[in-house]
């Protein structure tokens, strides 16, 4: 390795945008790409035409984008208040920071809290992998606890013990997803009670990437909890994964710090415009959610009929599928075989932590997925 590179980076591997791919090449479009929790619906043609017109007539390619994001922040604040039914003490632009995807915001939060041996982070696996990955790339220790295998609730006893015993550096940030990825379960009453009990010295990051599908939010907690941050994204329900726009909602003092550490001009003009157009037309874009939820219910019902499979309830736009005990193969081997057979059949899903995470696709994609799973189980 080059002598000027940090030695701990030698153990890392580059993140594959599509983990189901054997190479770094882009996944062919003819495959059913159900491995990254994207929306199955592209933007409507009329919105694409509006964006094309904006690019041609309004955006000046030779000029830097709006680095303050004020118009976008105002629009986001309005949507947050509307979606959380907040009338008193409403969210304002001062409560919003915008990032190049939620990943940038996660990285900024880590820089603001833990960099320079100031803190560690706590995550409960399985969960969104980027919390740990981004922390490790910054040299920040990652403390992990497990989850209850039955309902995927965080092992709260282990989590509390980790917070009490971890020193030099202490745990400064706890990351949770609501609902969790890959297991699709929302935070439980016990988990919420524990999060609320944590010291204000600890930052609690609640990732609501799938809020539009769960319709369960903790935005109202921010008024009385200045140590809480809520993350959201335009990549899922708003169909803008290609534009990389995420945002967080937090106390104005926390937002002021994030604005200090984020990169200048971090969002391209086209991404800013796309997010604004999406918010202005949110009623149209969010019309796809009932169909996705209906398809999710149909997929869970169909898969639950197979005695070999355990299918968890879902509050997101994906399901978590596990294999029951197989006398022929170890659970890991059986899961690997199923994953590979699905891929060979043209269905990409995510293999992770003892199960398969399957994004809800179009009705046609879901039918093919069911057929491919059925065929794979017959061959097993």
UniProtKB/Swiss-Prot annotation:
<protein>
    <recommendedName>
        <fullName>Histidinol-phosphate aminotransferase 2</fullName>
        <ecNumber>2.6.1.9</ecNumber>
    </recommendedName>
</protein>
<keyword id="KW-0808">Transferase</keyword>
<comment type="subunit">
    <text>Homodimer.</text>
</comment>
<feature type="modified residue" description="N6-(pyridoxal phosphate)lysine">
    <location>
        <position position="236"/>
    </location>
</feature>
<dbReference type="GO" id="GO:0000105">
    <property type="term" value="P:L-histidine biosynthetic process"/>
</dbReference>
<keyword id="KW-0663">Pyridoxal phosphate</keyword>
<dbReference type="GO" id="GO:0004400">
    <property type="term" value="F:histidinol-phosphate transaminase activity"/>
</dbReference>
<dbReference type="GO" id="GO:0030170">
    <property type="term" value="F:pyridoxal phosphate binding"/>
</dbReference>
<dbReference type="InterPro" id="IPR015421">
    <property type="entry name" value="PyrdxlP-dep_Trfase_major"/>
</dbReference>
<dbReference type="Pfam" id="PF00155">
    <property type="entry name" value="Aminotran_1_2"/>
</dbReference>
<keyword id="KW-0368">Histidine biosynthesis</keyword>
<comment type="similarity">
    <text>Belongs to the class-II pyridoxal-phosphate-dependent aminotransferase family. Histidinol-phosphate aminotransferase subfamily.</text>
</comment>
<dbReference type="InterPro" id="IPR005861">
    <property type="entry name" value="HisP_aminotrans"/>
</dbReference>
<keyword id="KW-0032">Aminotransferase</keyword>
<comment type="pathway">
    <text>Amino-acid biosynthesis; L-histidine biosynthesis; L-histidine from 5-phospho-alpha-D-ribose 1-diphosphate: step 7/9.</text>
</comment>
<keyword id="KW-0028">Amino-acid biosynthesis</keyword>
<dbReference type="InterPro" id="IPR004839">
    <property type="entry name" value="Aminotransferase_I/II_large"/>
</dbReference>
<dbReference type="InterPro" id="IPR015424">
    <property type="entry name" value="PyrdxlP-dep_Trfase"/>
</dbReference>
<dbReference type="InterPro" id="IPR015422">
    <property type="entry name" value="PyrdxlP-dep_Trfase_small"/>
</dbReference>
């Amino acid at each position: 390795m080059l002598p000027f590179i940090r030695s701990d980076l030698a153990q890392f591997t580059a993140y594959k945008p599509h983990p189901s791919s054997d190479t770094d090449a882009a996944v062919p479009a003819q495959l059913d790409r159900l491995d990254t929790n994207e929306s199955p619906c592209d933007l409507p043609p009329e919105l694409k035409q509006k964006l094309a017109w904006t690019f041609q007539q309004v955006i000046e390619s030779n000029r830097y984008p709006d680095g303050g994001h004020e118009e976008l922040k105002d629009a986001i604040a309005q949507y947050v208040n509307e979606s959380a039914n907040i009338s008193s003490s409403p969210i304002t632009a001062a409560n919003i920071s915008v990032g190049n995807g939620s990943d940038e915001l996660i990285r900024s939060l880590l820089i603001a809290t833990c960099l320079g041996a100031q803190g560690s982070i706590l995550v409960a696996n399985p969960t969104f992998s980027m919390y740990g990955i981004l922390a490790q790339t910054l040299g920040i220790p990652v403390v992990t606890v497990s989850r209850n295998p039955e309902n995927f609730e965080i092992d709260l006893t282990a989590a509390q013990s980790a917070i009490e015993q971890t020193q030099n550096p202490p745990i400064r940030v706890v990351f949770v997803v609501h609902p969790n990825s890959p297991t699709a379960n929302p935070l439980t009453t016990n988990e919420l009670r524990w999060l609320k009990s944590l010291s204000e010295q600890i930052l609690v990051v609640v990732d609501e990437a799938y809020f539009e599908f769960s319709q369960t939010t903790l935005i109202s907690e921010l008024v009385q909890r200045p140590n809480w941050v809520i993350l959201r994204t335009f990549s899922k329900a708003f169909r803008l994964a290609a534009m990389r726009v995420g945002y967080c909602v937090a106390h104005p003092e926390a937002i002021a710090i994030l604005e200090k550490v984020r990169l200048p001009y971090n969002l391209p003009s086209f991404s800013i415009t796309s997010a604004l157009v999406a918010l202005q037309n949110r009623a149209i874009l969010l019309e796809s959610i009932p169909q996705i939820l209906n398809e999710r219910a149909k997929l869970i019902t169909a898969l639950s009929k197979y005695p070999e499979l355990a299918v968890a309830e879902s509050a997101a736009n994906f399901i978590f599928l596990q294999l029951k005990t197989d006398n022929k193969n170890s659970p890991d081997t059986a899961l690997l075989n199923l994953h590979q057979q699905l891929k060979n059949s043209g269905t990409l899903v995510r293999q992770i932590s003892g199960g398969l995470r399957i994004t809800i696709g179009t009705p046609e994609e879901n039918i093919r997925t069911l057929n491919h799973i059925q065929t794979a189980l017959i061959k097993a």
